[in-house]
Amino acid sequence: MAKVNLEQIEHAVRLILEAIGDDPNREGVLDTPKRVAKMYAEVFSGMHEDPKEHLHKVFGEDHEELVLVKDIPFYSMCEHHLVPFYGVAHVAYIPQGGKVTGLSKLARTVDTIARRPQLQERITSTVANSIMEVLEPHGVMVVVEAEHMCMTMRGVKKPGAKTVTTAVRGVLENDAAARSEILSFIKTN
């Protein structure tokens, strides 16, 4: 996949400024195309990374009980409106066969998946699927809570409304008690 084309983004931003009736040569917005291009390169940096790469570093650890990293902050851009949505991800898995990854690797996986034009539902399922594929755990549960600026600043204008999505894989799919336990851990401080 090609890297971000900064010049093309700068040109597009100038066109947007003109299209909304602003003067792209006005002092306040003169450097806006360059700033937006740099910002897009950063917020869409996940386009050029494979999230699974973060998970390949494993530790041979004889632990086959729940591992939960909760309240992982993330931001992403809604692919429908190219405005931000942000929130927290909670990632739980039950290791199998001594395949335990570093806790930061779970956070990096979330970040890489979120840093592209996205849907919250896709972030949730892609994190779960990536963990299942690379770590081959007994089970995975991912819960994502986010506020979408496309619902806050436009359209229905409902600031504070949060969307919650889940993805459950492996043994957790049929174990309501284990899912409830994970959700109770997520709720506690």
Curated annotation (Swiss-Prot):
The keyword Zinc applies. GO terms for biological process: one-carbon metabolic process; tetrahydrobiopterin biosynthetic process; tetrahydrofolate biosynthetic process. SUPFAM superfamilies: Tetrahydrobiopterin biosynthesis enzymes-like. Pathway: Cofactor biosynthesis; 7,8-dihydroneopterin triphosphate biosynthesis; 7,8-dihydroneopterin triphosphate from GTP: step 1/1. Belongs to the GTP cyclohydrolase I family. One of its GO terms (molecular function) is GTP cyclohydrolase I activity. This is GTP cyclohydrolase 1. The gene is folE. GO terms for cellular component: cytoplasm. PROSITE patterns: GTP_CYCLOHYDROL_1_1, GTP_CYCLOHYDROL_1_2. Pfam families: GTP_cyclohydroI. It is an enzyme of class 3 (hydrolase). Its EC number is 3.5.4.16. Keywords: GTP-binding, Hydrolase, Metal-binding, Nucleotide-binding, One-carbon metabolism, Zinc. Homomer. It comes from the Bacteria. The keyword Secreted does not apply. Zn(2+) binds at residues 78, 81, 150. It catalyses: GTP + H2O = 7,8-dihydroneopterin 3'-triphosphate + formate + H(+).
